[in-house]
């Protein structure tokens, strides 16, 4: 999906679920990390995170669009548009939009080190110089035995 398709989908979702036009810009923002989308109060534009489209699919992405459009339409109507407001929660239920997003799994490289004396192994996220450090249990020399990718749930 590109920017023009995003704009078109945003306008269609707005008309279908809210019966109101979306008159501002919808753009992808790849710098968003922990949120699915963002409604900008000053410009009334909506920024969407393309990673949610890649990881969770189009149906989930439309849910995020509906959530951001709830902020958009309530703000323009001068009603409560924040997450804690009653108007916002009621509109979310009416259009069946999620209140919060699921976290995108992150890929982390874990480095494995093993003691040459006692054989104890441990994982670290950061690499370190094995010549400068020793085993905490026995004081033996360390060697890097490998690295592996781990996926985490939290951002």
Swiss-Prot record:
It is found in: Cytoplasm. Binds 1 zinc ion. GO terms for molecular function: zinc ion binding. NCBIfam families: PRK04351.1. Residues 7-145 form the SprT-like domain. Belongs to the SprT family. This is Protein SprT-like. Its cofactor is Zn(2+). InterPro entries: SprT-like_domain, SprT_Zn_ribbon, Uncharacterised_SprT-like. Pfam families: SprT-like (PF10263), Zn_ribbon_SprT (PF17283).
């Amino acid at each position: 999906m590109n920017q023009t398709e995003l704009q078109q989908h945003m306008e269609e979702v707005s008309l279908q679920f809210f019966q109101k036009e979306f008159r501002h810009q919808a753009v992808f923002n790849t710098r968003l990390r922990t949120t699915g989308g963002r409604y900008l109060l000053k410009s009334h534009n909506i920024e969407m995170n393309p990673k949610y489209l890649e990881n969770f699919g189009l149906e989930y992405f439309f849910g995020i669009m509906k959530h951001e459009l709830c902020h958009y339409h309530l703000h323009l109507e001068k009603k409560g548009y924040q997450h804690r407001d009653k108007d916002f929660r009621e509109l979310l239920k009416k259009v069946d939009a999620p209140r919060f997003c699921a976290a995108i799994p992150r890929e982390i490289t874990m480095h494995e080190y093993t003691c040459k004396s006692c054989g104890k192994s441990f994982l670290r996220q950061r690499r370190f110089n094995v010549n400068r450090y020793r085993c905490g249990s026995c004081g033996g020399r360390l060697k890097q035995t490998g690295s592996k990718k781990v996926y985490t749930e939290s951002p």
